From Swiss-Prot:
Cofactor(s) recorded in Swiss-Prot or TrEMBL: Zn(2+)
UniProt family annotation: Belongs to the PyrI family.
Annotated source species: Saccharolobus solfataricus (strain ATCC 35092 / DSM 1617 / JCM 11322 / P2)
Organism lineage string: Archaea, Thermoproteota, Thermoprotei, Sulfolobales, Sulfolobaceae
Name under which the protein is recorded: Aspartate carbamoyltransferase regulatory chain
Biological role: Involved in allosteric regulation of aspartate carbamoyltransferase.
Keywords carried by this UniProt record: Metal-binding, Pyrimidine biosynthesis, Zinc
Annotated residues for binding of Zn(2+): C113, C118, C142, C145
Gene: pyrI
Keyword Zinc: yes
GO terms under biological process: 'de novo' pyrimidine nucleobase biosynthetic process; pyrimidine nucleotide biosynthetic process
Length: 159
C-alpha cells in the first residue's frame, strides 16, 4: 500500500472500496482507529499516515481502510476529536461521497458525563446530553449537571 517515489515524498496507494479519513489533527489517528474498533486483526487493509504536512491544518494524520464504511455514530465520535476531518467514501477507486465533519450543537448518547452524581450515571433510562460551548478548544457542558468536559476528557473516554 506504500511506496516511495521521491526522496521526501511518501505515496500511499489508492483503495478500491472503503473509507479515507483525512485532515485528522496530527497524533489522533490511533484514537480514530480505536473509535472504529480496528486493532489490526480484523482483516481490513489499513494505511496510517501520521504527522505529515497539511496546508489546511499544519500537520495531519490520514487513515485509509479498505472494504469498511464507517457509520454515523463512528463519524460523530470522530468529529469530537477531529473536527476538521473529512470522510471520503471510495467505490471502485472513485470518491463517491465526501463529508466535512462539524461538531454538532448538541451531542446525545455518544459520551458519558464524568460526574458520578449526574443523573445519566444513575438512571439507566437517562441518555447523556451535552451542549457544545466551544469547538476550538472543544468544550462541552452536560445538560443535566452542567459539568464541563474538554477534548482531553473525550479522548480519555475513547482510549
Amino acid at each position: 500500500m506504500i511506496s516511495s517515489s521521491k526522496r521526501d515524498e511518501l505515496i500511499v496507494s489508492k483503495i478500491r472500496n472503503g473509507t479515507v479519513i483525512d485532515h485528522i489533527p496530527a497524533g489522533r489517528a490511533l484514537a480514530v482507529l480505536r473509535i472504529l474498533g480496528i486493532r489490526g486483526s480484523e482483516g481490513y487493509r489499513v494505511a496510517l499516515v501520521m504527522n505529515v504536512e497539511s496546508k489546511k491544518i499544519g500537520r495531519k494524520d490520514i487513515v485509509k481502510i479498505e472494504d469498511r464504511v464507517i457509520d454515523e455514530k463512528e463519524a460523530s465520535l470522530i468529529t469530537l476529536i477531529a473536527p476538521s476531518a473529512t470522510i471520503n467514501i471510495i467505490r471502485d477507486y472513485v470518491v463517491t461521497e465526501k463529508r466535512h465533519l462539524e461538531v454538532p450543537k448538541q451531542i446525545r448518547g455518544l459520551i458519558k458525563c464524568p460526574n458520578p452524581q449526574c443523573i445519566t450515571n444513575n438512571d439507566v433510562e437517562a441518555e447523556s446530553r451535552f451542549i457544545t460551548i466551544s469547538i476550538k478548544p472543544l468544550k462541552l457542558k452536560c445538560k443535566y449537571c452542567e459539568m464541563y468536559i474538554t477534548e482531553d476528557d473525550v479522548i480519555r473516554q475513547i482510549l
